[in-house]
Amino acid sequence: MKTLLLTLVVVTIVCLDVGNSFSCYKTPDVKSEPCAPGENLCYTKTWCDRFCSIRGKVIELGCAATCPPAEPRKDITCCSTDNCNPHPAH
């Protein structure tokens, strides 16, 4: 009986853990959304375009399996906890 109970507890924990998903803020809606399996990083990418002096930097938020590579004139930060990439203006 103890073995059956222990088995049920382990199965329950495994099933609950599978149901949990990693979430990040994503643009354009700037809302928290689940990431695809294997994407366990959130990123924030900012840069200036030709309208930067009028509206500020362009901001891209999303999920990634690895931190996006550096790009000229773009600031990229990554983090590894749920919703750790809020919009800088919020």
Curated annotation (Swiss-Prot):
Keyword Secreted present in the record's keywords: the answer is yes
Please provide one cellular component term from the Gene Ontology annotations of this protein: extracellular region
Cystine pairs: 24-42, 35-63, 48-52, 67-78, 79-84
| Compartments reported by the entry | Secreted
Keyword Signal assigned: yes
Q: Which residues form the signal peptide?
A: 1-21
Q: Name one GO molecular function term.
A: acetylcholine receptor inhibitor activity
Q: Which UniProt keywords apply?
A: Acetylcholine receptor inhibiting toxin, Disulfide bond, Ion channel impairing toxin, Neurotoxin, Postsynaptic neurotoxin, Secreted, Signal, Toxin
Hey, what tissues is this thing expressed in?
Expressed by the venom gland.
Pfam families, per database record: Toxin_cobra-type
UniProt-listed InterPro entries: Snake_3FTx, Snake_toxin-like_sf, Snake_toxin_con_site, Toxin_cobra-type
Q: Which SUPFAM superfamilies match?
A: Snake toxin-like
Q: Which function does this protein serve?
A: Binds with high affinity to muscular (alpha-1/CHRNA1) and neuronal (alpha-7/CHRNA7) nicotinic acetylcholine receptor (nAChR) and inhibits acetylcholine from binding to the receptor, thereby impairing neuromuscular and neuronal transmission.
Name the protein family: Belongs to the three-finger toxin family. Long-chain subfamily. Type II alpha-neurotoxin sub-subfamily.
Protein's UniProt name: Long neurotoxin 1
